[in-house]
Structure formats: structure tokens, C-alpha cells
Amino acid sequence: MSFVESWRSVGPRRRRQVTPGPVTRSVYSDYTQGNSWSEDGDEGCDQVARDLRAEFSARASSESKRAPLLPRIGDGSPVLPDKRNGIFPATAAKRTQARRWPIQALSILCSLLFAVLLAFLLAIAYLIVKELHTENSKNEDVVDTGLLGFWSLLIISLTAGLSCCSFSWTVTYFDSFEPGMFPPTPLSPARFKKLTGHSFHMGYSMAILNGVVAALTVAWCLM
């Protein structure tokens, strides 16, 4: 009895395994007949396409809310910014500006302090020269006797010349792409000489010339 019962239980299992056979043949027959895409398949593809479109539209709307609006051309298409090495130039410019603004502020502050110091020194020199001019005396032979000696005149004129030269050189330094040399000389550095092709820098040469002219002018006025 046990053998017969086991044979009966195995029989339906075999039938269950054999039953999908005709279904597969019908499917293959449908493909051979050219009906590869049925109505159910079309509906499934349409559903997938709708889901993808909804996802893309949701992403586009979220990105448009987060990102600023791009300018558009005449046909309505947006103008995309240029991208170099994975970085947009606007982003790189903002980063460099954020890094350089402390240096620029410090340079402006140093320039203002230098200008104030120079103005203070020139004001003191003007007061000294004015006081010395009023103290000029005449002797009994009606000969003008100046209280300024040679060394005093030389020191005052050199101070005025160096102050004017330093101020001109500082202005040229901040306004030129060539950093120049220190102490200030009219010669350009070797690496910039290869780029520009000339060994003299006109800006620094004019700064030194301004100092010389200022020294000569002060000496001429005090003599």
C-alpha cells in the first residue's frame, strides 16, 4: 500500500511540471508569428515611461528651485556656463576673490598708513623750513646769513627725495604686474626680462626720477 500511495503522489507532481510546456510553446509561437509585443507589454512599457518622465520632471523642478535661473537666448534655450576641468569659472572666481580680499584690504591699509606718514613728515619739514626762513638775519654789512648749513640742507633734501621716491615706487608696485626689486632699482628681474624683452622698467625708473627731482627742488628752494 505504501508503494502505491507514493506512486500516486508522484504522478500529480509530474503532471504539474509538464503542464507549463504548452504555455511556453504558445509564447514562442507568438514570437514567431511576429506578435512579440502584446497589449500587456505595451501597457507595462508605457507605465515605465510614465514613471521615468515623472521622476525626471521632479528632479528638474527641484534643481530649478535650488539653482539660479540661467539667461536664455532668442530661441528660448538656456545659456549654459563654460566648464573647465570640472569647475565653473564663476565658482573659481568667487573662491579666488574670497581668498584675496584680506590681502587686498591689508595692502590698501598699508598704502593709506604710508601716505599719512609721508604727509606728516612733509608737514613737519614744511614747518621747520618756514621757521628757519623767518629766522634769517642780516649782519652789519647787509649780508644775508642763512641758518641752514650744508649738511642740514643735504639731509632735508635727501629726506624729501627718498620720501617721494618711496611713495612713487610703492604706487608703481601695487599698479604693476612686475613686482620689481628691493631696494628699488630701474632694472627688471631676470624672469620678467625674458617675458617683456627689456631690462628697464619705466615705472620704477620714473619713481627714482621723481625722488631725484624732489631732492633738487627742495635744495634749490632752501638755498
UniProtKB/Swiss-Prot annotation:
InterPro entries: ARL6IP6. Residues 26-38 have a biased composition (Polar residues). GO terms for cellular component: nuclear inner membrane. The keyword Phosphoprotein applies. The chain crosses the membrane at residues 108-128, 142-162, 202-222. Residues 1-44 are annotated as: Disordered. Pfam families: ARL6IP6 (PF15062). It comes from the Eukaryota. Keywords: Membrane, Nucleus, Phosphoprotein, Transmembrane, Transmembrane helix. It is found in: Nucleus inner membrane. It is a multi-pass membrane protein. This is ADP-ribosylation factor-like protein 6-interacting protein 6. The gene is Arl6ip6.
